[in-house]
């Protein structure tokens, strides 16, 4: 399946769609294009599936320190994004979870909301594997993908697959992980930066870093094919 993932809201909190939850969005811009809607139209035209990136962490929203209020805010966002106005959504890529303890995000509410509106949507949370009670979500070396062991704990639960950008998983990736004593099958989705040394966006300070060469991308892809 071919799909694209569009950023709906990054850590800065700016919403790239026509939202009624905040004025920190495209409606307050001179260019009021609903970016998510335009990408959805292009996907439909070219036969490509649509996925969404959404940052849990928000450096702008005033209610962010209040876990309950902020969870309501996120649910309102995800309801708008998943209610069908943008068509079928095949993946939700959640990021920024390291900024609060795991329980603060109320991932069960997020997961249930998305699955109710888009039952086939697959949900992943960055830095999925680790101890659930980690204060910041920052793991030790044990929980880097190359070190994953069968039955390691799932930190970000519930979710459908594992993320840990931009790290590679081991070739004999076990895929079986646990939460509250129950085992779950969770494949790994690989993400690769356009430039080497963990550079996701264009910035002058990264301009001299080499681009990821195609041979390395192909090599990584072939490793993932075996897992």
Regions found by a protein language model. Give the residues of each.
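Mature catalytic domains of secreted/periplasmic carbohydrate-active enzymes
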Residues: 1-227
